[in-house]
Amino acid sequence: MVLIEFLTGFFYLYGKRLFSISKVMDMICLDYYTIIPAPLAMMLAARLKNYDLMKRLHEWEISVDYALLVVDDVPSIDFCLSLGAKSPTRAQKRELLRDNTFNPVYKYLMNCSGFPTKREKNIPCDVQCERLQKNIIKELVFNCSVLLEMVLHTEREYAYALHCAAKHNQLPILMYCWQQSTDAESILLKTCCSDKNINCFNYCILYGGAQNLDAAMVEAAKHDARMLINYCVMLGGRSLNEAKETAAMFGHIECAQHCFKLQSYVMDTLNVDETD
């Protein structure tokens, strides 16, 4: 786990990828037995359709059977069969799900690749997978893991990961998801303001630029986040009238009064500056 955390810091540096996720997997799997269980290494390689890595793992006597748990396209299945893969037994599945550390990853990979377990067949597949996705994303974000990218595929998933990263102040993941999400600014503002999280708010202003100050003030007013409104004013935000009206609309009377006082203060300050 230490190496995974070490790689995480280098994988996301100032929001730029230094090397591909396949390269990260190669680096992890060079010493897989001390870091992640062998079945997970094979399953993740299969999920990425990294056939070279799958072949290498197979040569290291890691069972390719596990790959069949997470592939559903003909080329990948054919490749697994060419390496002698057989359908994993129930015992193998149970063994994976007993691993407390990686259980959410196994469960996500197996259940959201077209192979729902018998116990969960009564739950609609889309509902089941959405729950699993949220659980695994939340856990991987919290641990700032390089494995996160392997379970993010849709705009909705990136948005949820961004939301979790903001809540937990996970800057590397926040930077990565910011680049992938088309609605990053709106998601961040809502998360930061509802939690009254100044650190998250700083990230939003930092990556969104000063043009976000006005939108940030209005969003903060919706959540009665007066501290964040003060912060925006200090940085040069001047949409206090809109913030005041928004606060009143959402029933935050004290916040609306606060905006009115700030508005008077800002106007007085500007008048003094003009006089000087």
UniProtKB/Swiss-Prot annotation:
Family listed: Belongs to the asfivirus MGF 360 family.
Function field: Plays a role in virus cell tropism, and may be required for efficient virus replication in macrophages.
Protein name per UniProt: Protein MGF 360-15R
Organism: African swine fever virus (isolate Warthog/Namibia/Wart80/1980) (ASFV)
Lineage of origin: Viruses, Varidnaviria, Bamfordvirae, Nucleocytoviricota, Pokkesviricetes
